[in-house]
Swiss-Prot record:
Name of the protein described by the UniProt record: UPF0225 protein YE2246
Entries under InterPro entries matching the protein: NTF2-like_dom_sf (IPR032710), SEC_C_motif (IPR004027), UPF0225 (IPR023006), YchJ-like_M (IPR048469)
Organism the protein comes from: Yersinia enterocolitica serotype O:8 / biotype 1B (strain NCTC 13174 / 8081)
Family under the similarity heading: Belongs to the UPF0225 family.
Source taxonomy: Bacteria, Pseudomonadati, Pseudomonadota, Gammaproteobacteria, Enterobacterales
Amino acid sequence: MSEQCPCGSTLEYQRCCEPYIMGTEIAAKPSILMRSRYSAYVKKNVDYLIATWHPDCNAEQWRDGIIQSFSNTTWQGLTVIAEMAGDHDNEAFVEFIARFKDANSTQVSAMHERSRFLRIKEHWYYIDGIRPSVGRNDTCPCGSGKKYKKCCGR
């Protein structure tokens, strides 16, 4: 039976993010890399996550923490908001909201980030991200429709 890709596309996993995670294809755009990284979190593939961090990040140092986070987090969904060009051809940004449940909570939380990607030769890499601030009276980014202060901002 086919499995829908965790990244939120309408494609089957085998035809969407799996080829990137398995190393048989290279993500041609930052949004593809971001979606495949989300799927790697869902699939608990620490090797792909580390390989797709920019080399300057020395991501190997985070391996144990990433592995530990796998047992504490259940990913609930991904919404890509926008993909934007950077200051040069080898820089781009992807804004997204990733919804998740922490093992210590029954509440769905959300991570809203504007991720920065840099290209080295033909490969895109995640380097860092900025989390936009959410006002207490803003709509919660988790998608509940509630105000932030009554939802994830408690």
